[in-house]
Amino acid sequence: SMKRERIYLFDTTLRDGQQTPGVDFSVEDKIVIANMLDEFGFDYVEGGYPGANPTDTAFFEKKRTVKSRFVAFGMTKRAGISASNDPGLAALLQANSDCICFVAKSWDYHVRVALGCTNEENLESIRESVEAAKAAGKEPMVDCEHFFDGFKANPEYAMACAKAAHDAGARWVVLCDTNGGTLPSEI
């Protein structure tokens, strides 16, 4: 018999959709939309970035889905601070969510310029953030930001970022084409 593959659906309307010009969800808007997405049957509903703004922080004071896994989005811990002392990571761990989706740099250029740390420090931030989420009982996932640009520049390092996330226990490692410039033939 044919093996049936399971496709998991992840909705990011409440986080990435909110970055659309002219869109500014209130907490009430987010609650209504989360209920609709939950009823539609999405496996995951990404609710926003707790700690980044008052709306998202308030939205994560309660779990807002019944069937769907409720996802908090945020950055990996900063280099030079322990996981237990990083306020951004603390906000994610305290959010009433089932999962944490970490956005992680996977392009060595961004590690150097945006994060101002070494490649190894970034790998450590990925590992320790995923481990902290797991220890807190959250399902960890990692968005490897600008993965394909990073892969073109330094394939070994981009893959090392994805592998660090996987080996630390991330349930999902997402290879993001952040700029949307990668053609199917290149993958």
Per-region residue spans from a language model:
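Alpha/beta enzyme core
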Residues: 4-9, 15-16, 20-45, 52, ...
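A glycine-rich helix N-cap at a beta->alpha junction
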Residues: 69-73
